[in-house]
């Protein structure tokens, strides 16, 4: 179960790092980058939620 937690955390970390380019472009006025950023943030929210659920499940299993 711990492997799944680490995998989900790494996925979350990569996604957040990939947001940086579009976030900077959006701050400079690029509206398309803003759309991509918001879409990626929704994915971040989902992955973070899944990570919390997996963490709780792992705690209960111990």
Regions found by a protein language model. Give the residues of each.
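N-terminal acidic leader/helix
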Residues: 1-22
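A structural signal for well-ordered alpha-helices, especially hydrophobic packing surfaces
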Residues: 16, 20-23, 45-48, 52-55
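Intrinsically disordered, compositionally biased charged tails
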Residues: 1, 60-62
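Short, charged, amphipathic alpha-helical segments
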Residues: 34-42
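A charge-rich, low-complexity, intrinsically flexible signal that marks solvent-exposed coils, linkers
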Residues: 15, 33, 55-56, 60
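Short, surface-exposed loop/turn segments at secondary-structure junctions
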Residues: 27-35
